[in-house]
Amino acid sequence: MNDKKRLQMEEMKAVWETSGAPLIQVKDLEKHFDDLHALNGVSVDINKGDVVFVVGPSGSGKSTFLRCLNRLEEPTAGAILFEGVNITDRMTDINLHRQKMGMVFQQFNLFPHMTIMKNLTLGPMKLQNMSKEAAEAQ
């Protein structure tokens, strides 16, 4: 990441941290696949440190919701704010925000010889040169 982008991220985070806003805010999120409405008006606030479970029957939109949070799926409508930044805005550099979020997919490919913690911290340590302690603290 270049210095200009890093500074922009630090400035956005500083504004968010002083605002008291949730870490993730989802507002009226919708995702349609033609006539199928996988998500319809989903709204939720997730604060830093919250543990959240997404539970529902097969086909209820759980994976679609998580894919939208990471913007691997483009929502049909609504907004997702991460640290106060609307990541559903096409002008937002989603790659800057993906550096601070991760996801283990339903059909995951973890390294079987490593613990879950080692699998989760591998990316931040290798891609961001983060220390083991810092990666685990995330």
Residue spans for each PLM region:
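Helix-to-loop junction immediately C-terminal to a conserved catalytic motif
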Residues: N70
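ABC-family P-loop ATPase nucleotide-binding domain
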Residues: M1-E30
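The feature captures the beta-strand-to-loop junction immediately N-terminal to the Walker
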Residues: V55-P57
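Short coil-to-beta microelement around the adenine-binding A-loop and adjacent beta1/P-loop entry
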Residues: L23, L36-H37, N95
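Conserved ABC transporter NBD signature motif
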Residues: G78-D89
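Short coil-to-helix segment of the ABC ATPase nucleotide-binding domain corresponding to the Q-loop/switch region
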Residues: H113-G123
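ABC ATPase NBD coupling module
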Residues: I87-G102, K132-E133
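ABC-type ATPase nucleotide-binding domains, specifically the catalytic core motifs of the NBD
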Residues: D34, V52, R90-M91, T121-A134
